[in-house]
Amino acid sequence: MPAGLRNVDTESAWSKSGYRGWVQGYRLILQGLVFPAPVPLFARWCPNTVGESTVLAEALAADHLPVTELLLGDSTFGGADLVATYAHHGGWLLTPQQLPATPNSWKRDLYAYRRETIELLFQRLIQACDLKICPTKGLARTGTFVLASVWLYQVLFLDNYRSHRPLAHIKEFIDEARWRIAA
């Protein structure tokens, strides 16, 4: 643990991210649909040291992961065994390892959409449920808080669908509920 850090969650772990360098904390793994609006289908909370591909493989083996026709994943999901397992379950797992070398290809265009879609889903979830700062510590407590936020997002999405309201108007409902509680 680096010296000088305050208020550290001692249950959390350090791991090296290809995107952010060394990070301390936990990991939320999301699978989502993009159309007609971003919504989580699957969520798993785990220590930061647990690999995403491990979680995906375990969820597939236990039939906990909804298999979609197409799953766009980053390079951590690109192992041949995992790609084959996902295909065996009826889906296509597209990762950088499956992309052709030529820059102009429909597979590359399709894969480029991954960054926009997953980042949008995480951003909407963080904003809607105010997840910038978690008020709890520990794997179980933070996991409960974060997974309850994912569940709330899913429930409000479904309610919007059934009520013929705009699907992505989730933050507005949560903000209105907060306002009513405060009043």
Residue map of PLM features:
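A short, flexible helix-boundary coil/loop motif
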Residues: 87, 109, 127-136, 156-183
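Membrane-interface transmembrane-helix boundary segments in multi-pass integral membrane proteins
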Residues: 137-149
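Polybasic low-complexity intrinsically disordered regions
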Residues: 1-75, 80-88
